[in-house]
């Protein structure tokens, strides 16, 4: 009798939706589902359990066929215990997510920061080698770093927290307590502050206003582009990665952002032979629109 192939499960728990994937031992996607994330510690746990059981139903495999579960989630993550703290967009102050989910489904669980998980997933899905940096342009700003297929977190786990790199001491106050951090320029929260008369989706609204000829909107978008290009430059000069992958919700702005980043990098290269030699525009890649990078990366981490 042939022994059933064990699957690896990955969950990407975000503030609005949770995505779950199942990978076979060769890393191929054999199951995927999405569902709304319910907020609050107990409901986040319940969402995670429903996602795992949903994959079991979708793949026709019992929970015992799942070798491991990895979870990518925002907030402060203790990778040793699986505890999550301060995940504010999930209305979650503290949750022993790894232990409690493992008790509910009977499968080993590992928990990781969502940006690190997305970096690993992007590295796997795009079949990259060497050193890669994943730039997450979302509500906040952070980067994940992968070296030879493994996450690099630094001595204290803060490698990649470039959102809290100050670039203007006279700039806006940052939630971290500093002033003028990159996150106050290149993030969804920065756009919301700079374009307060936007609707439910300020980033999309400000781009539409810019395209309609609004001068103020054009200045907001230009500041976002300059900040995002600065992030690429920081990652290139500090890590010298082969590729810099742009992910996060803001990437969906498309050409106004991505084309603007590349144009800015090219402009800087014209002004600096040093930057020109680094060929930064060529290193920039964009995560595809419907990519499951964070969930796939979580599955890899869980193994």
Where are these regions (language model features)?
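Glycine-rich phosphate-binding loop of actin/hexokinase-like ATP-binding domains
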Residues: 130-185
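ATP-binding/phosphotransfer module of carbohydrate and carboxylate kinases, centering on a glycine-rich
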Residues: 1-68, 78-81, 103-107, 121-131, ...
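Glycine/small-residue-rich loop that forms an oxyanion/phosphate-binding "nest" at active or ligand-binding sites
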Residues: 110, 116
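A short acidic/small-residue loop/turn micro-motif
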Residues: 36-39, 92, 158-161
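Short hydrophobic alpha-helix segments
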Residues: 33-35, 88, 155
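A charged helix-plus-loop insertion that forms the helical arch/lid used to bind
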Residues: 82-93
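Short, glycine/acidic-enriched loop or turn micro-motifs at the edges of active sites
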Residues: 15, 117, 139
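Short beta-strand segments
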Residues: 12, 68-74, 112, 134-140, ...
């Amino acid at each position: 009798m042939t022994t059933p192939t064990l699957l690896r499960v990955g969950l990407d728990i975000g503030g609005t939706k949770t995505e779950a994937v199942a990978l076979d031992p060769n890393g191929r996607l054999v199951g995927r589902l999405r569902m709304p994330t319910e907020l609050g510690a107990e409901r986040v746990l319940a969402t995670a359990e429903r996602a795992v059981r949903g994959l079991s139903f979708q793949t026709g495999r019992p929970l015992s066929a799942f070798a491991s579960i990895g979870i990518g989630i925002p907030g402060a993550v203790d990778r040793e215990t699986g505890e999550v703290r301060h995940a504010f967009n999930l209305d979650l102050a503290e949750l022993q997510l790894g232990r409690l989910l493992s008790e509910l489904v009977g499968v080993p669980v590992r928990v990781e920061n969502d940006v690190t998980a997305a970096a690993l997933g992007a590295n796997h899905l795009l079949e990259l080698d060497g050193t890669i940096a994943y730039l997450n342009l979302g509500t906040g700003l952070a980067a994940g770093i992968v070296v030879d297929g493994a996450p690099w977190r630094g001595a204290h786990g803060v490698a990649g927290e470039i959102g809290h790199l100050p670039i203007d001491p006279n700039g806006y106050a940052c939630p971290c307590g500093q002033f003028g951090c990159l996150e106050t320029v290149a993030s969804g929260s920065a756009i919301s502050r700079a374009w307060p008369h936007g609707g439910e989706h300020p980033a999309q609204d400000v781009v539409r206003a810019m395209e309609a000829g609004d001068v103020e909107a054009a200045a907001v978008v230009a500041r976002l582009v300059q900040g995002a290009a600065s992030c690429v430059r920081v990652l290139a000069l500090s890590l010298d990665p082969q590729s810099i992958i742009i992910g996060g919700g803001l990437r969906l702005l498309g050409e106004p952002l991505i084309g603007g980043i590349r144009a800015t990098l090219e402009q800087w290269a014209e002004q600096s032979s040093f930057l020109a030699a680094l060929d930064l525009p060529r290193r920039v890649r964009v995560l595809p629109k419907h990519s499951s990078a964070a969930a796939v990366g979580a599955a890899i981490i869980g193994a």
